[in-house]
Amino acid sequence: MMYLWPQAGDIKHLPSGFGVMSRPSDNTIPQGVQEGRVFAIDNEAFTRGFDPERFFRFLEKLAPYRNQVLFVVVPDAVADAAATLDLFEQWAPQIQARGFPVAFVLQDGQEDLELPMRQDFTDWLGDNGDEIDPEDDAAFYAAKGQWEGDCVAFDALFIGGSTEYKLGPETAEFIRWAKRLGLWVHVGRVNSLKRFRQFQLLGADSCDGTFPCYAPTTAARRLSKAVGQPTLFFGGEPC
């Protein structure tokens, strides 16, 4: 599993399993990005609050590096799935129109709501000329899986939410669903080797956290081991 290092840090010394998590408030092109590292762009809703003008100005600045972008985090509301869906509908099209892949942030309660799709299931069936026997469960689930793959409205699933929700069974199922569709899965706030290992085993592709901001030397050492030799770590040593 890849680790996305905070933008402000120097990552020249880190191995290839590290990318960059960039922030609009830094207002500079990260050194790691200039060196060719892959990166993601945060919306800062969790830390500073989303600032549309600053956010889109930053996207414009990073447009020449679009081919290195893993995802742009669409604005979200912490621990509120319904509000996050509204924000996604408002802001995702504007980000996609600029040629960037987008990440939908999973928040508490999403299991009771519909995920963002470009077309609803009934319309998709009509457009594809498919008629499903209501008694044929296998045909129904096969068609639904194809519809999800064709119509999912985002490129990456960002695991947010409260800590309790993030570690719960609903989130694990969403990760499995996303991987079946071939989506990138990123986990926020990963600050221990135990949690790194947990989400790696679930199939997540990348993660980030705050520990490098407070103890960069220790974080670089421990995370380099976790990224390079992840199967060796099962415990909860802080990282």
Residue ranges with predicted function:
Residues 1-91, 228-230, 235-237:
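Non-catalytic, usually N-terminal nucleic-acid engagement modules in DNA/RNA processing proteins
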Residues 1-3, 36-39, 97-103, 174-188:
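Short beta-strand/loop segments at the ligand-binding rim of alpha/beta enzyme cores
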Residues 53-57, 112-124, 184-185, 191-206:
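Catalytic cores of alpha/beta
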